[in-house]
Amino acid sequence: SSVSAGIRSSSAVSEVVRLTNSARGQNGYAALVEDGALSEAAAVRAREIARSFSHTRPSGASFSSALSESGVTYLRAGENIASGQKSASEVVNAWMNSPGHRANILNSSYSRIGSASVNIDGTLYWVQLFAD
């Protein structure tokens, strides 16, 4: 389908995770483990933010409901979203230069990460989901 064709290569998404873990390491935090169910939820959210750029889903529910729908159990969760950046390094740099996004990346409560990116009409939309 055209939607799945828009999902970015796993290498771009893997690079987001690698750079995120590098930033955590430089600041004294443990690396996050990539979680398949979180990544599935991130892919759902990437398509949603292309329609409505918000932490609230198009249905009106919180972003965290996408985690539950993908079978993720958690006590604490966070979401970083972005649009327009052309590469993994560009988006992680943007997040690290934004206090709220940086706080998610450097949150010691989180142990798992899921990431996704989708290309809609030439614009890249990026999502990171975090869970404890």
PLM regions and their residue ranges:
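Short, surface-exposed glycine/acidic/tryptophan-bearing loops
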Residues: E40-S89, I105
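A short alpha-helix/helix-coil micro-patch that ends at or immediately precedes a cysteine
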Residues: V3-R51
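Disulfide-stabilized extracellular recognition modules
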Residues: A82-D132
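Hydrophobic side chains within well-formed alpha-helices
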Residues: A12, V16, E34, L38, ...
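Surface-exposed patches in mature extracellular/periplasmic domains of secreted proteins
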Residues: Q26-E40, F53-F63, R102-V118
